[in-house]
From Swiss-Prot:
Protein family according to the UniProt entry: Belongs to the acyl carrier protein (ACP) family.
Residue positions, PTM O-(pantetheine 4'-phosphoryl)serine: 36
Post-translational modification: 4'-phosphopantetheine is transferred from CoA to a specific serine of apo-ACP by AcpS. This modification is essential for activity because fatty acids are bound in thioester linkage to the sulfhydryl of the prosthetic group.
Protein name per Swiss-Prot or TrEMBL: Acyl carrier protein
Domain Carrier: from-to ranges: 1-76
A GO biological-process term: lipid A biosynthetic process
MF term (GO), any: acyl binding
Key words, A-Z: Cytoplasm, Fatty acid biosynthesis, Fatty acid metabolism, Lipid biosynthesis, Lipid metabolism, Phosphopantetheine, Phosphoprotein
Entry function: Carrier of the growing fatty acid chain in fatty acid biosynthesis.
Pathway: Lipid metabolism; fatty acid biosynthesis
Gene (UniProt): acpP
Keyword Aminoacyl-tRNA synthetase applies: no
Species the sequence originates in: Deinococcus geothermalis (strain DSM 11300 / CIP 105573 / AG-3a)
Domain of life: Bacteria
Length: 76
């Protein structure tokens, strides 16, 4: 099952943000400053780390750190 810390690790790596800014309620674009390319790279990083495939439709719904954790948990 995806843990917050595992997802956080990918976010810090892909977005280059400070780990302390990555909270469950943090929004990728508004709070963490991700642009569209970084968002795609983040989704790909999560797919690689957790061995899942995230459809474009689902990716558009994943806007917060907690949403990513919940989505990954539902796919494992």
């Amino acid at each position: 099952m995806a843990t917050f810390d595992e997802v956080k690790e990918v976010i810090v790596d892909k977005l280059g943000v400070d780990a302390d800014k990555v909270t469950p309620e943090a929004r990728f674009v508004e709070d963490l400053g991700a642009d569209s390319l970084e968002t795609v790279e983040l989704i790909m990083g999560l797919e690689d780390k957790f061995g899942i495939s995230i459809s474009d439709e689902d990716a558009e719904k994943i806007r917060t750190v907690q949403a990513a954790v919940d989505y990954i948990g539902s796919k494992q």
